[in-house]
């Protein structure tokens, strides 16, 4: 007998309980030690039950504006009265995030402006308030028509072109509130190890394709640097670096360009909804990536973090600039107020404040990485091509693990989750595989992993609508079953991509514990993304995510729909 002594002098037979240090040993631990103790039920819904599930109108597929906070009141509260003209601007996140001292420049500007007590031509006191929403999501909300702020300030002018394409014509008031730029942040040490030499957009792409750099990108439907990156990459792939000229929509139909994009996507190490989330993962695990796409402001801040002093920026694309526009429904008094605010924030004192938060003075871009601005048709095709080819020709396997314990009945959690799954089901590329497991007292396999088509989409919809909440929280029992299903799929298809999305509103109250699964998770080769749903202690979920270099997302009933849709769109 082979034995080791652990705390308290207990002898452990390592032949019966072998260490977990590989994918195969993780499977052995699951199949021989953990799964035999778990009772798994099956309750599959026939696809026919989904016949009564009607598609939601576009406006209902998007979050309500009230799900996002308002910022800007100098006293911390909103001063509504008949003598106040409140002017709402929907702003990109990097400059209006009230939670980050280094990312709240426009919030500071609004508070200072409001303290001036300026009045409009009709005598009302002007109050500017900001609602921070990712640029791409905000554009979708404006097009859908359910949200009508007075102004819009995305991170770049690309989103204005997409608005025009969809029939919403903005009026430019300020071409640039603050300077910024898209960059690839590259680890200097990793670049030297890959061969060194001139650090530029083209060589970075070549070494990523060669597997010499681990690179992260973000979703071009949401993220300005992500859209800028895809446009620049396709522009260079189409051969414009030498001859110049704008990328044309017809060029994106070429098989050679589509195959090149697919090959590149095979080499991308991570895709996250936004670069802000990817940066947080990178900060926790500096060795996870060698390079990542982001805004230059964020690069400057990341460079000051411990362990990131060797970062070098590779600028590309057009100036981002954060334009300010009025919208077709903006009233005359609102437009005048926006114009005043635009002049205020572009004044020298406010630009100095912006520089103190790492905005301004964007790095110059060489002509070989600076495509001319694209129109909405081209940008829309860039987004669609990314969605079609982002999996790099590999099958993506997504297992959904959903908490249906009794607490999910509170605060409309379960009904909003059903709605979110209904909407997100439309974001899945056909041919990828999706499965659904629920857990309360025990895990229940509701939909085994299966290729996604019209039939399986109908089954997913029917299954989602049939979810019911009751019982305790056997989180790790469910996690063990979901991991096993995905690891079996990986054995059959070692070239696939494997994701486990875990949604829970509480801590485990029965069954296995994290310690039972930690080494299995570590060696599973599965990307795990937990969602802490509601007002919960997310400490355990953060531990789960950290094991596989992931991030925890926080959701609530108001915002679970866009969150799950974004994760599906990015992963599937």
Show where each model-derived region lies.
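Periplasmic-binding protein-like
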Residues: 174-183, 218-221, 258-264, 305-331, 335, 344-364, ...
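Short beta-strand-loop
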Residues: 433-466, 483-492, 510-516, 538-546
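N-terminal segment of the mature folded domain
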Residues: 19-222
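Acidic, polar low-complexity linker/tail segments
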Residues: 19, 23-43, 62-64, 357-400, ...
């Amino acid at each position: 007998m082979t034995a080791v002594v652990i705390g308290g002098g207990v002898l452990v037979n390592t032949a019966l309980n072998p260490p977990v240090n590989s994918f195969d040993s993780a499977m052995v631990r699951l199949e021989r030690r953990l799964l035999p103790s778990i009772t798994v039920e099956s309750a599959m819904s026939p696809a026919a039950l989904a016949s009564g599930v009607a598609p939601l109108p576009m406006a209902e597929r998007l979050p309500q504006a009230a799900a996002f906070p308002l910022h800007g009141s100098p006293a911390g509260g909103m001063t509504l009265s008949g003598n106040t003209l409140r002017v709402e601007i929907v702003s990109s996140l990097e400059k209006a995030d009230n939670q980050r001292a280094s990312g709240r420049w426009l919030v500071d500007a609004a508070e200072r402006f409001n303290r001036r007590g300026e009045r409009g031509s009709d005598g009302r006191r002007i109050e500017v308030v900001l609602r921070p929403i990712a640029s791409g999501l905000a554009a979708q909300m404006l097009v859908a028509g359910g949200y009508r702020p007075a102004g819009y300030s995305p991170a770049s002018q690309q989103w204005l072109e997409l608005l025009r394409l969809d029939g919403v014509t903005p009026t430019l008031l300020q071409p640039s509130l603050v300077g910024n730029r898209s960059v690839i942040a590259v680890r200097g040490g990793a670049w030297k190890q890959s061969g060194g030499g001139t650090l530029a957009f083209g060589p970075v792409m070549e070494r990523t394709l060669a597997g010499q750099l681990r690179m992260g990108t973000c979703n071009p439907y949401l993220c300005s640097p992500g859209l800028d990156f895809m446009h620049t990459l396709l522009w260079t792939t189409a051969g414009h670096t030498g001859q110049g000229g704008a990328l044309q929509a017809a060029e994106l139909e070429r098989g050679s360009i589509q195959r090149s994009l697919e090959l590149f996507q095979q080499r991308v190490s991570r895709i996250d909804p936004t670069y802000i989330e990817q940066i947080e993962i990178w900060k926790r695990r500096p060795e996870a990536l060698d390079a990542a796409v982001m805004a230059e402001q964020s690069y400057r801040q990341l460079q000051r973090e411990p362990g990131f002093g060797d970062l070098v920026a590779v600028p590309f694309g057009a100036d981002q600039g954060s334009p300010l526009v009025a919208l077709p429904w903006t009233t005359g008094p609102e437009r005048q107020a926006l114009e005043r605010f635009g002049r205020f924030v572009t004044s020298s004192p406010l630009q100095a404040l912006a520089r103190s938060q790492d905005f301004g003075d964007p790095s110059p871009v060489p002509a070989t990485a600076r495509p001319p601005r694209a129109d909405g048709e081209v940008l829309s095709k860039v987004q669609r091509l990314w969605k079609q080819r982002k999996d790099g020709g590999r099958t993506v396997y997504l297992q959904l693990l959903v908490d249906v314990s009794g607490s999910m009945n509170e605060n409309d959690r379960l009904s909003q989750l059903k709605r979110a799954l209904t909407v997100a089901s439309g974001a899945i590329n056909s041919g990828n595989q999706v499965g659904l497991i629920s857990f309360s007292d025990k895990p229940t396999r509701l939909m085994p992993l299966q290729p996604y088509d019209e039939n399986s989409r109908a089954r997913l919809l029917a299954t989602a609508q049939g979810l019911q909440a009751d019982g305790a929280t056997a989180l790790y029992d469910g996690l063990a079953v979901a991991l096993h299903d995905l690891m079996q799929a990986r054995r059959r298809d070692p070239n696939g991509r494997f994701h486990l999305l875990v949604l829970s509103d509480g801590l485990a109250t029965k069954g296995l514990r994290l310690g039972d699964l930690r080494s299995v998770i570590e060696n599973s080769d599965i990307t795990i993304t937990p969602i802490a749903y509601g007002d919960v202690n997310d400490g355990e979920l953060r531990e789960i995510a950290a094991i596989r270099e992931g991030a925890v997302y926080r959701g609530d009933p108001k915002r679970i729909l866009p969150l799950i849709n974004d994760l599906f769109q990015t992963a599937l």
